[in-house]
């Protein structure tokens, strides 16, 4: 993959070509003020940051792509950006997950988890699927289960008010994404809850879902399968990184559109679009990375 930067708009003027992560453009011929860019690779993506060392707001674009004017959305760039790009990233950032699976004090585990080892393996499978979804989108984000604990707590096994829930300090790890897997949220239809940057640190996933059967009208519960939990994890990661439901623009395959997360009420599997068709658009991914370079900057590696 190669990216060619130009000092002037419309691919004119002096140029510099980069093929790897470049934490500072200052030493290149174009310096830190390129005005246009070309991403030559048929696959691959790039993050253009306004500050050195991959800091500041991020502009994300997939290849192949011609950006005739970095400061104009209509020309492939972003309004208000001008020619202020100071660093470029082409390899993924890693987010380390600190996972707490909540059991009752008698040892009962969430959802269909049968043992601590089974919970560990299921979480690993969910994260692997989430990484596939992110990889399909060339999101330049990978997830790693770096900490895993089963924690006994009757009060956190089923979460009554997920948006107001607080968790013990011992469950949190600075520099990690704190993920809590509970049994279920009391609110029907809720498979996960996460607050945006500056409002919360915990990404909550449920292993079991309460819902109203549309045929009988009766309330039911179902254990969630790995694929539905993975879609929920990526959706909640979006919230964690500051993007919200409207960012999906109602797209039938957009991961941030709540209507996309359809499920089979009999086995808890994902019943929405094919996993390979689920998407995050360029602006959503760019906004996620802007949060990871800002309010969530301690979480990325």
Give residue spans per PLM region.
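Compact beta-sheet-dominated domain cores in extracellular/mature segments
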Residues: 1-94, 127
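Active-site-proximal segment of zinc-dependent metalloprotease catalytic domains
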Residues: 14, 91-93, 165-248, 262
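Structural alpha-beta junctions
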Residues: 28-32, 72-75, 128, 132-141, ...
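Short, solvent-exposed loop/turn elements at domain surfaces
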Residues: 12-16, 105-114, 187-190, 263-273
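A mature extracytoplasmic/lumenal domain signature
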Residues: 10, 52-53, 101-103, 147, ...
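The catalytic-center signature of Zn2+-dependent metalloproteases
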Residues: 214-301
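Structural recognition of the beta-strand scaffold that forms the well-ordered cores
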Residues: 47, 97-101, 143-144, 178-181, ...
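Propeptide-to-catalytic entry region of secreted or membrane-anchored zinc metalloproteases
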Residues: 91-177, 181-186, 296
